[in-house]
Regions:
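C-terminal nucleotide
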Residues: 1-15, 19, 28, 32, ...
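Conserved, well-ordered active-site substructure
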Residues: 24-26
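Helix-loop-helix module between adjacent transmembrane segments
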Residues: 83, 113-115
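Glycine-rich nucleotide-binding loop
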Residues: 100-102, 302
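Short, charged, amphipathic alpha-helices and their helix-cap/turn boundaries
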Residues: 104-105, 142-145
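Short glycine/threonine-rich catalytic loop with a Thr-x-Gly-x-Asp
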Residues: 117-119, 295-301
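DPxDG-like acidic metal-binding loop motif
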Residues: 117-137
Length: 335
């Protein structure tokens, strides 16, 4: 029996997020410390195996309430099902004939949940990779993020942008330009300009995430989308500014101007704070890191932060201070 195993890694937005859903620009990194893995093999029926994240057994009603508060109502089964449906639709729309063999598929993930590290899209991307391998269908790399995004936006009605899917498909570090001027359409799929950057250009960076408090990403994004669509100038100007920060960040990386990059990271968060109403515990994470002398911004939708630190002594201080407020700190593995 041939067993197909595919992984997709957590990600952190270095600069520009959350402008990816608003024709902005971002730089993101993949974090190989955390991953989702999907295993698929031939079976006599289509069998989606429940994961430990799809909890249905609780110690008490209070345990159930706590699980919902931290992780929301949904596990990964709906993501796998929606990915399969979207893949089949993609192939049908292009007259790509699929063989009639069935499969069993299961997933597991160690990506911290609901802290903005793209745990949901990692399951989708890993599932999509398994399906392409099983059916011998090769979706062009530049189009894969858009197909993965459509699983959430079209199948599940979740507000999301391309950033997470781009970095999980490309891996490493990627500069992304979502301006309409660079928009391209191939085989009915819309995509944008994605440029790989050498991870060796990165300064010493940390990622810290809270392991007790969280907020589902789909909840986080909804209000800003409505304000943007209504033409609120504060939100529109902020999204444009995120793009400018990203262009400057790319230049800072290429010239190894780490002090400039660090300042841009701080400015990214300050701009975000000007348009979002943020929970105090998320602000506290950023301010705690800054008091250590590091830069800090959200790595995603909130619950995890990323920034530049100076040396090992500073990193140890960050770890200690973050632990004191219930957060864990890592050095992300990026390659």
């Amino acid at each position: 029996m041939d067993i197909i195993r595919k992984r997709a890694y957590a990600r952190a937005g270095l600069l520009g997020n959350p402008s990816d859903g608003y024709n902005g620009k971002t730089i993101s990194i993949s974090i190989r410390n955390f991953r989702a893995e999907v295993v698929l093999y031939e079976w006599d029926s289509v069998d989606i195996v429940q994961s430990g994240d799809d909890r249905a057994d609780f110690r008490s009603i209070h345990d159930l309430v706590q699980d919902v508060r931290l992780h929301g109502y949904y596990g990964g089964i709906r993501l796998v099902k929606a990915t399969i449906k979207r893949f089949v639709d993609y192939c049908r729309e292009r007259n790509l004939k699929l063989h009639d063999r069935n499969f069993s598929v299961r997933y597991e993930t160690n990506i911290p949940r609901q802290v903005g590290m793209a745990g949901s899209s990692s399951i989708i991307v890993a599932t999509l990779r398994c399906l392409m391998k099983f059916y011998g269908v090769e979706i062009p790399l530049a189009q894969q993020p858009s197909v993965a995004l459509s699983v959430e936006t079209e199948e599940l009605g979740i507000s999301a942008g391309l950033q997470d899917r781009v970095i999980q498909c490309y891996e490493g570090m990627v500069y992304m330009d979502f301006d309409r001027l660079v928009e391209r359409v191939a085989d009915g799929v819309t995509f944008y300009a994605y440029e790989r950057l050498d991870p060796a250009l990165l300064p010493p960076i940390y990622v810290a995430y809270h392991y007790e408090l969280s907020e589902p990403t789909e909840t986080f994004h909804n209000d800003i989308r409505g304000r943007y669509d209504c033409g609120e100038s504060l939100v529109i100007n902020a999204m444009q500014h995120f793009g400018r920060l990203t262009v400057q960040g790319r230049e800072a990386l290429l010239s190894r101007d780490w002090e400039r990059l660090s300042a841009l990271i701080d400015e990214n968060f300050d701009t975000r704070r000007s348009i979002y109403k943020l929970p105090s515990w998320q602000i506290n994470m950023v301010e705690t890191a800054r008091r250590c002398g590091a830069s800090a911004k959200f790595a995603g939708s909130g619950g995890a932060i990323i920034g530049v630190y100076r040396d090992e002594a500073m990193f140890r201080v960050i770890c200690d201070r973050m632990a004191a407020i219930g957060a864990h700190t890592i050095k992300p593995v990026v390659n």
